[in-house]
Curated annotation (Swiss-Prot):
Signal peptide: none
Region Disordered, residue ranges: 1-26
Protein name: Vacuolar ATPase assembly integral membrane protein VMA21 homolog
GO CC terms of this entry: endoplasmic reticulum membrane; endoplasmic reticulum-Golgi intermediate compartment membrane; ER to Golgi transport vesicle membrane
Originating species: Drosophila ananassae (Fruit fly)
Amino acid sequence: MSNKNKKSGGAGNGAAQKQTRQQSHDSQDYSSFKIVLFYCMLIVFLPVVTFFLLKGFVLDRFFSLSEVKVNIASAVGAVVSLHIALGLYIYRAYFGATGSKAVKED
C-alpha cells in the first residue's frame, strides 16, 4: 500500500508540472499570436491609411498638383510605409526574439 501512495503522489506532481508547462506554452503562444496579429494589421492598414492621409489632407490641400500626380505621390508614400512596416516585422522576428529560447523537452 505504501508503494501505491508514493506512485500516486509522484504522478500528481508530474501532472501539476505538465499543467504549468502547458499554461506556460499557452501564454507564449498567445503572446506570439498578439505580436503577429499586430504586425499583420500594421502591414495591411498602414499603407491604406497613409495613402488616404497623403491624398486627402497633405497633397491636395498644401500643394497645387494635378490629380494624377497626387495619386502617384500617395501611392509612393503607401509603398514606403509598407516597406517600413515589413522592415519592422523582419527586425522584430530576427533580433527581437532573444528572450524566447527553445527548451528541449522529453
